[in-house]
Amino acid sequence: MSVPGIVPEFARIAPDVKLGRDVTIHGLVNLYGCEIGDGTMIGAFVEIQKKARIGRRCKVSSHSFICEGVVIDDECFIGHHVVFINDRYPAAVNPDGSPQTAADWQVIGTRVERRASIGSGTVVLCGVTIGEGAIVGAGSVVTHDVPPRTVVAGNPARALRRLPA
């Protein structure tokens, strides 16, 4: 597969990945079963899992992890080291002590709406929606929905102010 900005031996892009036009992917990425929209840039050391969808003209900065069930709409910014979580109660073993497998958990989706911006080092827990045009400050832990055009920050992230329409 030929993609601008990639040295193939340093990137793992599975055959089931759907890449839009003019996507730029920097080396040392792991992409499988995902969809990436036109004009989006994916930084180095990023993993995007199956059934995740990234919209058009987004920027996903280096070292970020976008797991199954995450939908990022058009024109969003994802800072460095942003982590999305898709399992509300992660565990290594079941109550009986047997190792957990993929069949033992339920994926809970997350949505990032158009033109939202997520600062570096943020953790986004499952089941939340980050509203259109919202800004999440660096290092935040997002545990609840973020309303559109709202600036949030902290652990847990709290609303700091509303942005003009």
Residue spans for each PLM region:
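C-terminal/domain-terminus segments
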Residues: 128-145, 149-151
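Flexible, glycine/small-residue-enriched loop-and-beta-strand segment within the central core
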Residues: 2-15, 25-126, 155-156, 161-164
